[in-house]
């Protein structure tokens, strides 16, 4: 379409999908922006302070390097119901006011169930990916920015989580990102 893109998170569900987006943007000479709206505020989500003094402190080297940053996604208990899917959902009739095929978009077709579609859609791999892809970036993006890692990626990612269901997202206990430096 020859247009620049302003994309809301999550950009893609897989690294491969993300690489294809980058390739298409480069091939077409377009501008692409993945929105994380806290970048346009004085304070980032969960920091409790303005960004620039903290960025200046880190950039000064006074804290040394490498830094270890620990973030926690401690939120209200009810949010966890939105982030965790259920396996073995029974098919239900599609409500008359819902165009289910339109709602699914490019996601694989699965029988309708209210838990899969409405507020709790975040708990299913086909549509979101749970708390990590829904709210995780709000915690991780400030760290990427503050550490000057916007143009790089971790070289190692370690996950402590129970085995995940192929369809329904489960709990993530701990994720460790290691960068080259």
Please place each PLM-identified region on the residue numbering.
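Beta-strand-loop-alpha-helix segment that lines the small-molecule cofactor/substrate pocket
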Residues: 1-42, 59
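Structural recognition of the beta-strand scaffold that forms the well-ordered cores
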Residues: 6-7, 12-13, 31-34, 67-71, ...
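Stable alpha-helical elements in mature extracytoplasmic
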Residues: 1, 17, 50, 96-99, ...
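Secondary-structure transition/capping motifs at alpha-helix termini
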Residues: 2, 24-31, 60-64, 147-153, ...
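Rossmann-like NAD(P)H-binding beta-loop-alpha module
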Residues: 42-103
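Rossmann-like dinucleotide-binding domain that binds NAD(P)(H)
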Residues: 93-94, 101-181
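Short, surface-exposed recognition loops and adjoining beta-strand edges that mediate ligand/DNA contacts
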Residues: 37-38, 42-44, 72-80, 157-172
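Active-site-proximal cap/loop segments of hydrolase catalytic domains
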Residues: 18, 46, 51, 79, ...
């Amino acid at each position: 379409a020859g247009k620049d893109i302003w994309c809301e998170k999550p950009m893609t569900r897989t690294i491969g999908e993300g690489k294809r987006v980058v390739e298409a943007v480069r091939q077409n000479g377009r501008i692409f922006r993945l929105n994380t709206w806290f970048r346009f505020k004085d304070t980032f989500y969960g920091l409790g302070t303005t960004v620039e003094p903290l960025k200046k402190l880190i950039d000064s080297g006074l804290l040394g390097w490498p830094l270890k940053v620990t973030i926690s996604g401690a939120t209200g208990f009810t949010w966890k119901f939105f982030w965790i899917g259920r396996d073995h959902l029974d098919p239900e009739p599609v409500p008359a006011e819902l165009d289910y095929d339109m709602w699914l978009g490019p996601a694989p077709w699965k029988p309708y169930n209210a838990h899969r579609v409405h507020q709790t859609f975040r708990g299913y791999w086909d549509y979101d990916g749970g708390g990590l892809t829904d709210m995780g970036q709000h915690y991780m993006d400030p760290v990427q920015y503050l550490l000057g890692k916007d143009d790089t990626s971790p070289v190692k990612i370690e996950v402590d989580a129970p085995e995940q269901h192929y369809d329904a997202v489960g709990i993530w206990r701990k994720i460790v990102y290691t960068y080259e430096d």
